[in-house]
UniProtKB/Swiss-Prot annotation:
Reaction(s) catalysed (UniProt annotation): AMP(out) + CoA(in) = AMP(in) + CoA(out); 3'-dephospho-CoA(in) + AMP(out) = 3'-dephospho-CoA(out) + AMP(in); acetyl-CoA(in) + AMP(out) = acetyl-CoA(out) + AMP(in); AMP(in) + NAD(+)(out) = AMP(out) + NAD(+)(in)
Main location: cytoplasm
Topology with respect to the bilayer: Multi-pass membrane protein
Domain notes: The N- and C-terminal portions are exposed to the cytoplasm. Lacks a typical peroxisomal sorting signal. A region between helical transmembrane domains (TM) 4 and 5 and TM1-TM3 or TM4-TM6 are necessary for the peroxisome-targeting activity.
PANTHER family xrefs: PEROXISOMAL MEMBRANE PROTEIN PMP34 (PTHR45939:SF5), PEROXISOMAL MEMBRANE PROTEIN PMP34-RELATED (PTHR45939)
Protein name as catalogued: Peroxisomal membrane protein PMP34
Subcellular location: Cytoplasm; Peroxisome membrane
Length: 307
């Protein structure tokens, strides 16, 4: 119990949250482009650069940062939960011994499940706020009119029921493999490098963070597309119950996507996603590692986690 409620786990959680918020703020416009490509299927522009120019031209210079606050709020909570759970479970299971690839994957998966169940409502709301006011090419999308985060929660619960806040939970649960795979490769690559040197450089951390995220994103991207569509939940031609995003709905969306756009339709927006997530993850891990190390140094503490 002491390992779960330790100061060390809290330091890792705060550092992870700060790192993710910093990185997402820097690369937020890339995430805006990715989301438009996933949700607005009839948009003709295919590249990140073209979509961003379109958004700025049609909706204003600050449009790529629309929905920044709810996204950052959700991301901060989400990463705090994930890093806290990951490091607490690792401390309990590993108990000062060296970890392994298998243990990192299992701990990452469990941390991901906890994170999804607790924070999905925040992501549903921020997805809708981020897309509110966007000029869609798809006429099947029903516009929203939320005044803010609280009003969005109120309207969704009033009009669609409280379970609508967990739209897309099923694909989100499948997607816990994304951070699990990411952390498995990240921790594994760190272990390999630390066998050859005493300390990792900033460039080392940036590169292994980028590699780990690139692998995880490419493997799980089709499910991320389905997740975005279900969270948005404003398509007129999707009348069936989207709550929790059942396996049937997930398979149906995957089938429709392939039927309309071919197999590459499952990877629409991947360029923007890779560009954004790889750079974001790399910067996030860099800030996280530096902040964690600095905190332990200032407080005169020594990390009990062994990689």
């Amino acid at each position: 119990m002491a390992s779960v409620l330790s100061y060390e786990s809290l330091v890792h959680a705060v550092a992870g949250a700060v790192g993710s918020v910093t990185a997402m703020t820097v690369f937020f416009p890339l995430d805006t482009a990715r989301l438009r490509l996933q949700v607005d299927e009839k948009r003709k522009s295919k590249t990140t650069h073209a979509v961003l120019l379109e958004i700025i031209k049609e909706e204003g210079l600050l449009a790529p940062y629309r929905g920044w606050f709810p996204v950052i709020s959700s991301l901060c909570c989400s990463n705090f939960v994930y890093f806290y759970t990951f490091n607490s479970l690792k401390a309990v299971w590993v108990k000062g011994q060296r970890s392994s690839t298998g243990k990192d994957l299992v701990v990452g998966f469990v941390a991901g499940v906890v994170n999804v169940l607790l924070t999905t409502p925040l992501w549903v709301v921020n997805t809708r706020l981020k897309l509110q006011g966007a000029k869609f090419r798809n006429e099947d999308i029903i516009p929203t009119n939320y005044k803010g985060i609280i009003d969005a929660f109120h309207q969704i619960i009033r009009d669609e029921g409280i379970l609508a806040l967990w739209n897309g939970t099923f694909p989100s649960l499948l997607l816990v493999f994304n951070p699990a795979i990411q952390f498995m490769f990240y921790e594994g690559l760190k272990r390999q490098l630390l066998k050859k040197r005493m300390k990792l450089s900033s460039l080392d951390v940036f590169i292994i963070g980028a590699i780990a995220k690139a692998i995880a994103t490419t493997v799980t991207y089709p499910m991320q597309t389905v997740q975005s569509i279900l969270r948005f939940g404003r398509h007129r031609l999707n009348p069936e119950n989207r709550t929790l995003g059942s396996l049937r709905n997930v398979l149906s969306l995957l089938h429709q996507r392939v039927k309309r756009f071919g197999i590459m339709g499952l990877y629409k927006g991947l360029e923007a996603k890779l560009l954004q997530t790889v750079l974001t993850a790399a910067l996030m891990f860099l800030v996280y590692e530096k902040l964690t190390a600095a905190t332990f140094t200032v407080m005169g503490l020594k990390s009990t986690h062994k990689h």
